[in-house]
Each structure stands twice: as C-alpha cells, then as structure tokens.
A protein has these predicted regions:
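FAD-binding beta-loop-beta segment adjacent to the flavin cofactor pocket
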Residues: 40-57, 110, 132
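Conserved FAD/dinucleotide-binding core of flavoprotein oxidoreductases
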Residues: 1-43, 90-92
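C-terminal helical "tail/cap" subdomain of flavin- and related membrane-associated enzymes
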Residues: 85-215
Length: 215
C-alpha cells in the first residue's frame, strides 16, 4: 500500500477496512473525509535576513518547519519571548532589536528544522527496530542515574529551555557516543542480568556534567 495507490473513495474505504478495521469501525466516513481533505505537501522555509527596515519575520514566516517534533508553535512562542527580552535590552531601538533577533534565532530555526527532519526518519524507519528501542531504554537508564550528565535528545527539546541548535548538535554527539558503547558491550544481556548499572557507573561516574546553553 502507498498513498499514491489510493485514487478513489472506494480505495480508501477498502484500505482501512482491511488494514485498520478497528479504526474504520470508529470512523466509517473516512472515505468522505479523505476526499474533503486531500493530501498536501509539507514545506520548510529557510531564509535570511529576516528583517528590513521596520519589518521583521517571526515564527513560521521566518522558519516554518515540518511537524514531526511538534515544536512549531513553541518555537514561535520562544521568538516572542526573545523579541520581548531584546526590546527591553535595546530600549525599543528596532534596528538593533531586529538585527540581534535574527542573528540569535536563525541558528535555532535551522536547528528545529534539522530536528524535525531527523525525527521523521526516526519515526519512519526505527520505532519498531529492537536495537533502536534498546538504545532508548539504555539512554533513559543513563539519564535516571546521571541526569546532570546525560539528557536524552527528546527531553532536551521538549522539556527544557535548551536552544534547538544546541540540542540538535548535542543530540547527534550523544547518539554516536551511545552507539559506540552498544557496539562494544552486550547491553541487552546486561539488562537481563541487571549489570547495566555497573557499566553506566563505570562510564559516567567520572565524566563532567555538560553545559547545555539555554536560550
């Protein structure tokens, strides 16, 4: 099955009846809804500069992204907060405010877009992968034992004030580090034998807490 194979309402109804029968029972009008709301493309906007004279882009107009991290509205709210802070800092000198704003937020707009695309590939290719799920379990255990030394990428993005650009860079660094550990140790058997904590203490007890710069 693929979206491009669903040409008619009957195709849609047949697909959901066969593949998702429980869903079809709850929403038997899915064929009509499919026709009323056709598929549309998703876009990312990357541009710079964001300001000209007394006008500045903000939110989606500056850094629209795909929805795979659920952070689009939040990033817009962050823009508003930072713009307000800059208004106070620069005493409403709009030329200075806009220049400072776009310089500060452009890397984070790009960072959110990189995160969103990365999470799309994760959801598409890895959420049912046993090794990926084991890695997430391992990361959560590390974070529980050493929260000041290891914060999973999703937590950095969704439950902190860490800049998107910093979270993305740190997340990729952490991913490579954890993959290296897992390549050299049988993490699955360590969980089963309850020895995984010993390995975590061995690796992380002497590591310095990392500095994650917030907005």
């Amino acid at each position: 099955y693929a979206f491009d194979k669903l040409k008619t309402k009957d195709d849609v109804n047949h697909f959901f009846k066969e593949v998702f029968p429980d869903f079809y029972e709850m929403m038997p009008e899915i064929g009509d809804t499919w026709e009323d709301y056709p598929l549309a493309g998703l876009v990312i906007i990357r541009c710079f500069p964001w300001s000209f004279g007394k006008v500045s882009l903000i939110g989606d107009s500056a850094h629209a992204t795909v929805p795979f991290y659920g952070q689009g509205m939040n990033s817009g709210f962050e823009d508003c907060r930072i713009m307000n802070e800059l208004m106070i800092e620069h005493n409403e000198d709009w030329e200075k405010i806009f220049k400072a704003f776009e310089t500060l937020r452009k890397p984070d707009g790009d960072g959110l877009q990189d995160l969103s695309l990365y999470n799309y590939y994760v959801m598409r290719d890895y959420v049912a992968d046993p090794e990926f799920l084991l890695q997430k379990k391992f990361e959560l255990r590390i974070s529980k034992l050493y929260p000041e030394k290891y914060l999973p990428l999703y937590s950095q993005v969704s439950f902190s004030n860490i800049r998107y650009s910093v979270a993305y860079a740190k997340g990729m660094e952490q991913d490579a580090f954890i993959k290296e550990i897992m390549a050299n140790h049988d993490i699955r058997s360590m969980f089963e034998s309850e020895k995984v904590d010993d390995l975590i203490h061995e690796i992380f007890s002497d590591r310095e807490a990392y500095d994650l710069v917030s907005n």
